[in-house]
């Protein structure tokens, strides 16, 4: 399908399942001879907004706690990106910690407003995962309108974005809009494919 690099991505789950993922990733990377290059792990959650959980299991959503995420970082050196809702209590401190570990803090599954994204950007959140998917746009509270994550992604010039470029998650006009206003140098394309991709019709497991 033309995918040149693969970043296996987790879903919200128990910490025990996460540790299993770390072990499986290392084994799969050793066995991967002819496929897309494995370039690291992407942790998607569990620090997400319940209002924007999307396909994530809401039962496992939580706020960042230093003791927990430091243990996770200690358990795997393969993590290259961690997607978080930056408005959550403790998220900015997590972003700074990730930077110290040379891990990209990214914004996802979030109900943040523009001002919160600005603060997050200074704390290291310089990337948006799956732009437009499960994140805030313009909202209205008490008769006032607030710009959201989508608007912040465009207005913060050095913010990079990732879009699911399968032609289904985003229609062609939005893909063109992202390309026009963020440009090729600040836009990453991903498949967001799960294990059923390329398989015959039938049941498959997500995660």
Where are the language model's segments positioned?
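Divalent metal-dependent hydrolysis catalytic cores, especially in the metallo-beta-lactamase
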Residues: 1-20, 36-49, 76-87, 103-106, ...
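Active-site glycine- and acidic-residue-rich loops that bind
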Residues: 14-20, 87-89, 102-114, 164-181, ...
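Extended, charged catalytic domains and RNA/DNA-binding interfaces, predominantly
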Residues: 71, 79-139
């Amino acid at each position: 399908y033309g995918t040149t690099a693969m970043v296996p991505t987790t879903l919200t789950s128990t910490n025990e399942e996460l540790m299993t993922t770390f072990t499986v990733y290392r084994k799969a990377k050793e066995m991967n001879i002819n496929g897309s290059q494995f370039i690291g792990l992407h942790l998607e959650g569990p620090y997400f907004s319940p209002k924007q959980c999307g396909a994530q299991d809401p039962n496992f959503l939580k706020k960042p706690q230093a003791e927990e995420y430091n243990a996770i970082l200690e358990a795997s050196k393969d993590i290259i990106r961690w997607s978080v809702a930056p408005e959550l209590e403790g998220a900015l401190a997590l972003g700074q910690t990730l930077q110290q570990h040379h891990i990209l803090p990214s914004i996802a599954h979030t109900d943040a407003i523009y001002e919160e994204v600005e603060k997050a950007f200074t704390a290291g959140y310089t990337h948006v995962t799956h732009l437009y998917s499960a994140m805030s746009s313009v909202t209205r509270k008490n008769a006032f309108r607030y710009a959201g994550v989508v608007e912040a992604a465009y207005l913060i010039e050095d913010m990079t974005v990732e879009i699911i470029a399968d032609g289904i998650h985003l229609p062609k006009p939005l893909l063109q809009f992202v390309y026009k206003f963020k440009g090729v140098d600040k836009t990453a394309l991903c498949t967001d494919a799960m294990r059923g991709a390329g398989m015959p019709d039938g049941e498959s497991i997500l995660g």
